[in-house]
Amino acid sequence: MGWKTLDDMDLAGKVVLVRVDVNVPMEKGEVTDATRIEKIVPTVEDILKKGGKPVLLAHFGRPKGKVVDEMSLRLVLPALQKALPGTKVSFAPDCVGEEAEKAVAAMLEGEVLLLENTRFHAGEEKNDPELAAAMAKLGDVYVNDAFSAAHRAHSSTEGIARLLPSAAGRLMEAELKALDAALGQPERPVVAVVGGAKVSTKLDLLGNLVGRVDHLVIGGGMANTFLVAQGTEVGKSLAERDMAETAREIVAKAKAAGCTIHLPLDVVVAREFKAGAANETVEAGACPADAMILDAGPKTVAALSEVFASARTLIWNGPLGAFEIEPFDAATNAAALQVAQLTKAGQLISVAGGGDTVAALNKAGAAEGFSYISTAGGAFLEWMEGKELPGVAALNV
């Protein structure tokens, strides 16, 4: 791997600018889920142990280059302080300029400084070299620990990395290692599970995966579009009929690449989309005209369990059915629990990512069993699509 980690850096007495992701959900000015804040703690603590002074750079919300009080990182300070008990955490009202410089100069060893929202400056999202230089001026070393923002070429993720000695933080390092194990140099056979509502939003992803994995499992509303493309009737199910030709092209590309596509063999159908709705399981081609497909059936789950059992690596993005509503979470839950079991038994390396996916695996009680769960959202998807991530590429310099 062409990037450095904290282990490669001499940080003693140095000001370390750390790009973190603390873009957490808030309600009435209070953090409602501090997961992202907790995930940066190992990097911050490692820098402190090595005698460095961590200065945190982050964005919050979409202020579009203006100062918006409700998007001030000052609101995140109490949760950050709570995540670092016994460490003094200060706040600077800007991320560049005189106030930021004064705050950095006043730091003592063992202290942490959080700078104000980088997106309060219009240049941040334009990757303005002057803004990147003003940020770089504050520190001696740059560490990127925000894989979730690595698909954006911004001043604080890409521009600054070209101006200072740079390394990946612990969270970024774990993410890159997990992703390399899943798609970079994976143990074969490799299975990808791709679910969700629409083929149109995952075209690049499917196009990249068929050339890189041995098995592609398609679930959720997307599977209906592939069934339609085969000439199968899906009743009132969610399906993108205008994407049928595209779906056929993906199937042809998979065949040419030696990738087996797995579609539902049987489906759970209902007349209404609500919890506990009356439902029945039918063959994939037998969906009644007035019903909609809301989950994969038990035959499909049994077939998938054989595919999973023969695999060595699995990548998961998107649920197999309408997992938010019982009983249409059954296929997702059963498949996720089996993957977790195989992973715990040492038979499988499993990596999952994307908002719905993380929610579905948590709901199934399977998340803990996966090798790695990426909370990165867009960056995880772009990586699965085979795109170069600017924030990672800049660390290779």
Swiss-Prot record:
Protein's organism: Cereibacter sphaeroides (strain ATCC 17025 / ATH 2.4.3) (Rhodobacter sphaeroides)
Q: Which InterPro entries match?
A: Phosphoglycerate_kinase, Phosphoglycerate_kinase_CS, Phosphoglycerate_kinase_N, Phosphoglycerate_kinase_sf
Question: Which residues does the record give as substrate binding sites?
Answer: D21, V22, N23, R36, H59, F60, G61, R62, R119, R152
Q: What is the lineage of its organism?
A: Bacteria, Pseudomonadati, Pseudomonadota, Alphaproteobacteria, Rhodobacterales
Q: Which family does it belong to?
A: Belongs to the phosphoglycerate kinase family.
Specify the pathway: Carbohydrate degradation; glycolysis; pyruvate from D-glyceraldehyde 3-phosphate: step 2/5
| Positions bound to ATP | K202, E324, G354, G355, D356, T357
> Quaternary arrangement and interactors, per the entry?
Monomer.
What is the protein name given in its UniProt record? Phosphoglycerate kinase
